[in-house]
Structure formats: C-alpha cells, structure tokens
C-alpha cells in the first residue's frame, strides 16, 4: 500500500493531478468507457448514499415528496421555453433513431427536468387547494461537457432536483430560500464546508429564472466551486406551460415555481477542501467508515476486546481489519480512505488493558487509552476532528479572500493569488462578459451579508451599491 500512496502527486506540485490521483487511488471512481463518464466504485457511492440520506431527511421535514420522471424529453416540449433551450442547447444529447428507424421527433436526454415537471403540473393543478406541489427526484442527467473531471464536471452525473409550484409569489420565493438554508446547513454541519450564501448575477443565473441563489465554497487551491443552487422562477415557467389555478376569489391565476439541486460534485468539494498528500480526509458524518479497528494479531483475547469496543461504539460506522495483510498495509489503507478514527489493538497494549487511538488529520499523534473508556474518548476525538477540519477550511478561505476597487488591482491580485475577490460591481451582463474576457474569471455570488455602500464598478466605473465575489472556478 505504501507503493500505492506514492502514486499520489503532492498537492503543491500539481493540484489537478493530485486530485485525479486521490479519486483513482482511493477507489472512489474509475473512468467510464465513454469520454466524460465515470464509474462510481462502492466507496464513492457509499458517500453519495450518505449525502442522499441526510438531505432526504431534511427535505421530508418541509414536506417534499420524492418522484421519478422520464429520462427523455420531446424536442417540441423543450422548445417552449426559449431562454431555457438557449441555456442548454450546446450540451444536450439527442436521440434521433431507434435501431435503423428515424424518430418522427428528436428526444433530448434530460439535462434537467423543469420542462417535464411543468408539463405535468399543467395537467394536475386546477385549484389553490392543489397547491403547493413539492416534488424531488434523485436521478441522473446528461450535459455533454467539453472538459471533464471526475465528480466535478462529467457528461453524466447524479443529483437531486426539486421542483415546486405555489399559489403566491412570496410563498414560492420563501420556499426557494428555505431550501438554500437546508443546503447551507448541510454543507457547513455535515460536509464541513464553510460556504458563502448569495444571489447569482444576471449573467450567471439559471436560464429562465428570475433569481438564482447559491452556496459557494473555496477549494484548497483557491478556486471556487458552486455547491448548490435554488432557483426562483416567479411565473416565468408557469406562463409558458399555462399552469393556472382557481384562487380563493374564483379567478384564474398563474402559479409560481421553483427548482433546486445539488449533485455528486459535492464529493469533489470534499476531496479538494479536506484531503492531503496521503489520501482522503473525510468529515466524520459523511465517512462510510468512521472508526477503523486494526488488529495487530488475531488472538482470542483481541477478538473479545474488539467485540467489547464495537458494542461501546455501536453509534458509529465501524470496520474491523483482522486480515492477514501486514500491519503497515492496514495502517496505510485506513489512511488513504480518510477514515476519521483509527484504533490499533495488539497483545502488548492489552497487557495493560490499553489500545492505541489516533485521528486521520494527526497521524503521528497516537495516544494510549483504557479500552473501557473508548466511548468517551472517541466521542471527544470525533468532535475535535470535525471542528479542526472546518476551521482549517475556514482559515484557508480567510487567507484567500481579497478586496479590489479597480480592474487593475483585481488583475494584480490574480497574478499573485487564487481566491475570492470582493469587488464593487454594476451587475450588467455586458460588463461581466468583458471581465471574463480580460481575466478568465466570473462572478460567484452577491453575498447576503453585506452593507449597502455606494461605489464605482471596479471595471466600467458606473455607480453601484453591489459588492460581488469574483473568482476562478471549477
């Protein structure tokens, strides 16, 4: 296994290769036979299952129902919403024939399901009593990407997409923000990602949306990653798909809709935020294995102690390695998998009723404890471990957050650093396109937690009160 660990390129030499090495060497995923696709291996898929579990529980608290809609969308249906089709047309995969028979109408493989859901809702909704409809589906989607990387940007990926219809503008907008709060809490408390919440600019908002809200995270290398979005459509989609309901005054009125989603790119965010040159470093709540027990020898006494420890730590996901692999191999395997807590049990320690325990982020800091006290020790170590991961990520973000007031200052920062740059920005699409042309960066969000300050746009010098985060992004 040490030989396997040597395959991981150091982070400070080539971050991109380091990331790829982590994905492949930790057996999270493999490349698929079609360019841009990937195979989820068991360990990687278990992380996704835990993401699903946590989010599904939160969704159900706000009355979300799970459904499943078809993979294929008729072209005529998709074409109803011009902004939507324009936003996705370069990425859409199309089915044109079955066997040798040409289809009468092209079928799009879903890049997202707004149009399918809206078409369905138009037939289901008649009265205000039918509302709200709050649906979510866990599924795959396809967007034919030019440049792909496992988890971060693949032509086919897994995600959840929620779609809702409401009887009032305010109710829809509030629900959209409620979902964003769920994403923020999940990112911070489960994934230990110190995300920033905000609204997308006009240029970066979702095609067809009135407003797009986002959680943005900064990776270890200083590039941004969009971790989740919630879109408020107002009545943009419901007018196109003629979704009307009879209100309490018995008048017909267009409904209001939202959509929201996170994807398997969250796994990419975990890797690039927390991991190191020795492999994965996983937050405890999302780690498939939280505690790894390594038996140095297989004896009856050690087997008995292992069972006692497993019973005491029954609240945790535990794996016992009692294989005939070498001790060094077992240690390295636990390390590369990013398992938060490692317990080593050998005959010498047991003479004093002791075991050796360590944290993944502090490999050399091993302590010996009485195995009878293992529950309280692990409880505290897990808390300290998770807090350290979050604080390290937050410190990295603080150290890589800058301010600029002019395009010249902005370009100078980019020459020396990667990170979030807060700038006064006018918000115009044309201005942002000019910035992207000049710098290959774009806006990440208009943060919620900002005071209104009059200033000049850092690029075009027009008056503005907006402070916007710009960065290079995955």
Swiss-Prot record:
SMART domains: ProRS-C_1. One of its GO terms (cellular component) is cytoplasm. GO terms for molecular function: ATP binding; proline-tRNA ligase activity. Keywords: Aminoacyl-tRNA synthetase, ATP-binding, Cytoplasm, Ligase, Nucleotide-binding, Protein biosynthesis. The keyword ATP-binding applies. It catalyses: tRNA(Pro) + L-proline + ATP = L-prolyl-tRNA(Pro) + AMP + diphosphate. One of its GO terms (biological process) is prolyl-tRNA aminoacylation. Gene3D superfamilies: Anticodon-binding domain, Bira Bifunctional Protein, Domain 2, C-terminal domain of ProRS. Pfam families: HGTP_anticodon, ProRS-C_1, tRNA-synt_2b. PROSITE patterns: AA_TRNA_LIGASE_II. It is found in: Cytoplasm. Its main location: cytoplasm. CDD domains: ProRS_core_arch_euk. Its EC number is 6.1.1.15. The keyword Protein biosynthesis applies. Catalyzes the attachment of proline to tRNA(Pro) in a two-step reaction: proline is first activated by ATP to form Pro-AMP and then transferred to the acceptor end of tRNA(Pro). Consists of three domains: the N-terminal catalytic domain, the anticodon-binding domain and the C-terminal extension. Homodimer. Belongs to the class-II aminoacyl-tRNA synthetase family. ProS type 3 subfamily. This is Proline--tRNA ligase.
């Amino acid at each position: 296994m040490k030989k396997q660990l040597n395959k991981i390129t150091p982070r400070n030499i080539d971050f991109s290769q380091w990331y790829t090495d982590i994905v492949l060497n930790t057996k999270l995923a493999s490349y698929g036979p079609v360019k841009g696709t990937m195979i989820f291996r068991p360990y990687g898929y278990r992380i996704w299952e835990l993401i699903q579990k946590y989010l599904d529980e939160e969704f159900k608290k706000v009355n979300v129902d799970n459904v499943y809609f078809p993979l294929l969308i008729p072209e005529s249906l998709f074409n109803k919403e011009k902004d939507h089709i324009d936003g996705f047309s370069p990425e859409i995969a199309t089915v044109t024939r079955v066997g040798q028979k040409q289809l009468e109408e092209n079928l799009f493989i879903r890049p997202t399901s707004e149009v399918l859901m809206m078409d369905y809702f138009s037939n289901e909704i008649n009265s205000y009593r039918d509302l709200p409809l709050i649906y979510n589906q866990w599924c795959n989607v396809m967007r034919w990407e030019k440049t792909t990387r496992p988890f971060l940007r693949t032509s086919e990926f897994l995600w959840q997409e929620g779609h809702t219809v409401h009887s009032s503008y305010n109710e829809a907008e509030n629900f959209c923000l409620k979902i964003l709060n769920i994403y923020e809490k999940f990112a911070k408390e489960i994934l230990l990602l110190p995300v920033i919440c905000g609204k997308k600019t006009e240029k970066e908002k979702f095609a067809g949306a009135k407003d797009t809200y986002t959680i943005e995270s900064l990776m270890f290398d200083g590039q941004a990653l969009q971790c989740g979005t919630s879109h408020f459509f107002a009545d943009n989609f419901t007018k196109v798909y003629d979704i009307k309901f009879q209100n309490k005054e018995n008048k017909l009125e267009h409904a209001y809709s939202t959509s929201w989603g996170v994807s398997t790119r969250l796994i990419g965010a975990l890797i690039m935020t927390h991991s190191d040159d020795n492999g994965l470093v996983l937050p405890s709540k999302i780690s498939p294995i939280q505690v790894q027990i390594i038996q140095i020898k297989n004896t009856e006494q050690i087997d008995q102690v292992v069972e006692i420890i497993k019973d005491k730590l029954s609240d945790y996901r535990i794996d016992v390695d009692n294989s005939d692999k070498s001790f060094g191999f077992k240690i390295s395997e636990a390390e590369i998998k990013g398992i938060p807590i490692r317990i080593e049990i050998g005959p010498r320690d047991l003479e004093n009723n002791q075991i050796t325990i360590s944290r993944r982020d502090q490999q050399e800091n091993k302590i010996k404890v009485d195995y009878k006290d293992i529950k309280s020790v692990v409880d505290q170590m897990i808390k300290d471990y998770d807090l350290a991961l979050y604080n390290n990520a937050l410190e990295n973000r603080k150290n890589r957050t800058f301010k600029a007031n002019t395009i010249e200052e902005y370009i100078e920062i980019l020459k020396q650093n990667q990170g979030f740059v807060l700038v006064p920005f006018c918000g115009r699409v044309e201005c942002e396109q000019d910035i992207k042309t000049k710098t290959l960066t774009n806006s990440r969000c208009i943060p919620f937690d900002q005071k209104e300050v009059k200033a000049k746009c850092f690029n075009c010098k027009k008056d503005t009160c907006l402070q916007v985060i710009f960065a290079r992004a995955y």
